[in-house]
């Protein structure tokens, strides 16, 4: 699978906020407003994740005046002509997915992890629910419009980075309360149009959110980061059985060690792949210190696992 080969609508804030430099600080760093309305600290020439300085989505007034108008559905969010032409261009042998959007991860992008926490606990859950519902309703309408064009897809794919190395960035109970209906609504729509593989991209330790996803139609985990916390796919298989599929789950730190470490990882991948419904691969980028000859060796040997 090439999981980047998905097609979708414009389901972001539209129009986005103006991307502009608000202030240049004495150390040369800049406070920059992004298209999501967050204020980031950026150092020119430094390629890294910028720190979050501030955000606009702080209360109901900001939501209703600044954000809600940008979350509205309109037909031009979908390039209908492009999707109608997709079936005529299906001369490739790779699967094509429909992008199913994000229920909460993109909202976390809009208000930062800190801001999301304050919105829930210092403002009120009703406001946060209104934000989730407004954004989700627009996305659903776009996805439905795409499928109604007759374009054929092999899988659906969510993006939902809402976990980190210690688990979810939000209470699993509240996450389920706010998001379950929106996952089910979209996965039911996928089933209606013959799409039975629905994957979800979430980094970090996802175990506590799996019940929400699996019980509402998501059946494929990605990228199954190993990180510092270890394997997550085998426990998921033990709990949910073969209805949970996986893409990822390879411990890429083996590339920094030796051939024996890669062989051990290949053996672990082979056991998982032998059950079916699992495609091994490393997550994201390879780490500094990785040995290219070990990557080459893995790339050849992993084919034997599939």
What are these regions (language model features)?
Residues 19-43:
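Serine/threonine-rich low-complexity intrinsically disordered regions
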